[in-house]
Curated annotation (Swiss-Prot):
A motif (Q motif) lies at residues 9-37. Residues 513-537 have a biased composition (Basic residues). This is ATP-dependent RNA helicase DDX55. It comes from Xenopus laevis (African clawed frog). GO terms for cellular component: nucleolus. It holds the Pfam family DEAD. Residues 40-223 form the Helicase ATP-binding domain.
């Protein structure tokens, strides 16, 4: 099913509940989007749905509304701890967002309790909340939900609670699989009753997703919704109200271009994407220092407890910058995002589309810009062909001030900045080497000197990818980087303590090494003693060798070793060897005379 259009809520075959209609009016949703128009009637008619629609097309309401309608029509009212609907989504941020949208509706239905189960909170608290307040509708991330199913020892048996399940929603299903949740999803599906309605929503279709459809859905209706106004032969995957731009610049120009771009738009709200968590940490700090008083916030996948707070705070502010990784690339709906800036292209072409889709949400206008190196220019054509995502070049940006010296000065005066810069550079190169489109993004073609200057590095880091490379056009700082201190006095105090302990350890290990040498000498003496015993045994067994022969043999061996090590010359060796032999002969003569 593809040819669907927008329509009013009253045009639905089944009339919506009055409270749901009032909520839609409160939220100022007067018309359905194409995906809502296609999905809601089928879902309300008890069909399983596999829906593919572009990012920002209104998929959340496409499952929230029929989910509530199905629960309202239940013959038997749900008890507090009975689960009627389950929504699984890949990230905490998306789960929080869905939970908020759902709350706008459930506040009119006190008979339904809802609960949010995501990482970053104490699972024991989640169990307590569920037992106290119930959870007729659960919004969850896969990891936490799987953990809750296994927590029977805490007095909650979620397996029993989901026996009443009517609706299962897998939101951003392709991302669920991309993020490695396939095993968790299969485990969760094993706990759920077969008699249920299932809705699977995604922005792209893959073979892995097809396998999930076969495993989790029964005779699903497949829906692929295109943008209204897009030609039938086209399958453009970004909203038509989104303007996509690209800019070609050298690696050591990118940072200055980014600053110039953001300074011109200080009163607006932007997302700036980087390829790694370390790059977010480093450039986020740099932007915060150089763009004051603009509000700059950072979020990435390695943040545990702060992510939810930062995400909520950014959604509330009217202007500012959120520096992030692809943790923010899917499904997140932040109002009034003016620009999505991709400082680094993402690791896959599909992720490019999802990043852009954080602006121009549900009918709003928005713009996106990606910075590309000269060697990456063919990526523009690749996106146009592979993702049906046309881009136009932005050329008018003028750099007024070179801020790279300031970036280096920050590293020279604070070890935290210096270390973050080195770590960011290494992580960027490693991520670049793993790029999905490696015919365009070739790590061997990178200008590492220009890249290092763009990162404001004081010296080149040691890493395998740089082995054998020439960096004649990169000038390292004259400062001894080991002497750079942390601005944070406590961290610097701790560092000095560690340096002192390391020095003492090295000195101790040196003394131990000396002791080992002495022990080796003893070992050598024991070895010689063994040789004597062995030779003596041979003599007792009838050998012609006597103790004098043994001593002479050992002395000859020692002399030979000294010669090999260069401790004596050949002349000295011959002389001492003769002396040893002469001595033996004298001793033998005296013994014969006796």
């Amino acid at each position: 099913m593809e040819n669907v259009t927008e329509g009013t809520w009253d045009s639905l075959p089944q009339k919506l509940n009055g409270s749901i209609r009032r909520t839609l009016e409160e939220l100022k949703f007067t018309h359905m989007t194409p995906v809502q128009s296609a999905t809601i009637p089928l879902f309300m008619n008890n069909k399983d749905i596999a829906a593919e629609a572009i990012t920002g097309s209104g998929k959340t309401l496409a499952f929230v509304i029929p989910l509530l309608e199905i629960l309202l029509k239940r013959e038997e009212k749900l008890k507090k701890n009975q689960v009627g609907a389950l929504i699984i989504t890949p990230t905490r941020e998306l789960a929080v967002q869905i939970d908020e949208v759902l709350s706008c509706f459930t506040k009119h239905f006190p008979q339904f309790s809802q609960i949010l189960l995501i990482g970053g909170s104490n699972p024991v608290d989640d169990v307590r909340k569920f037992k106290e307040h119930g959870g007729n509708i659960i919004v969850a991330t896969p990891g936490r939900l799987e953990d809750m199913f296994r927590r029977q020892a805490d007095g909650l048996d979620l397996v029993i609670c989901v026996k009443t399940l009517d609706v299962l929603i897998l939101d951003e299903a392709d991302r669920l699989l991309d993020m490695g949740f396939e095993a968790s999803i299969n485990t969760i599906l094993g706990f759920l009753p077969k008699q249920r309605r299932t809705g699977l929503f995604s922005a792209t279709q893959t073979q892995e997703l097809e396998n999930l459809v076969r495993a989790g859905l029964r005779n699903p209706v497949r829906i692929a919704v295109k943008e209204k106004g897009v030609a039938a032969t086209s399958t453009q995957k970004t909203p038509i109200r989104l303007q996509n731009y690209y800019m070609i610049c050298k690696a050591d120009e990118k940072f200055n271009k980014l600053i110039a771009f953001l300074q011109k738009r200080k009163q607006e709200k932007h997302l700036v994407f980087f390829s790694t968590c370390a790059c977010v940490e480093y450039y986020g700090k740099a932007l915060e220092m150089l763009l004051k008083p603009v509000k700059v916030m950072c979020i990435h996948g390695k943040m545990k407890h702060k992510r939810n707070r930062i995400f909520t705070e950014f959604r509330k502010i009217n202007s500012g910058i959120l520096v992030c990784t692809d943790v923010m690339a899917r499904g997140i709906d932040i109002h009034e995002v003016n620009w999505v800036v991709q400082y680094d292209p993402p690791s896959s072409a599909s992720a490019f589309v999802h990043r852009c889709g954080r602006t121009a949400r549900i009918g709003h206008h928005g713009s996106a810009l990606v910075f590309l190196l000269p060697m990456e220019e063919s990526y523009v054509s690749f996106l146009s062909i592979n993702q049906k995502c046309p881009l136009q070049e932005m050329t008018e940006l003028i750099i007024s001030v070179d801020l790279l010296p300031k970036l280096k000065a920050m590293a020279e005066t604070d070890r935290a900045v210096f270390e973050k810069g080195m770590k960011a550079f290494v992580s960027y190169v490693q991520a670049y080497a793993k790029h999905e489109c490696n015919l365009i993004f070739r790590v061997k073609d990178l200008d590492f000197s220009s890249l290092a200057r763009g990162f404001g590095l004081l010296r080149m880091p040691r890493m395998p990818e740089l082995k054998g490379k020439n960096f004649s056009d990169f000038v390292s700082t004259l400062i001894d980087t080991d002497s750079i201190a942390y601005k944070d006095k406590n961290r610097e105090k701790q560092r000095q303590k560690m340096l002192k302990e390391r020095k003492e350890k090295l000195e101790t290990e040196g003394r131990k090494h000396f002791a080992k040498n002495k022990a080796w000498s003893k070992q050598k003496a024991r070895k010689e003693k063994k040789q004597k015993v062995a030779l003596k045994r041979k003599k007792e067994e009838g050998s012609d060798i006597d103790e004098g022969d043994v001593d002479e043999l050992l002395q000859d061996t020692r002399l030979l070793k000294r010669l090999k090590k260069g401790k004596i010359t050949e002349e000295e060796f011959e002389k001492q060897l003769t002396a040893v032999g002469g001595k033996s002969e004298v001793e033998e003569g005296s013994e014969d005379s006796n």
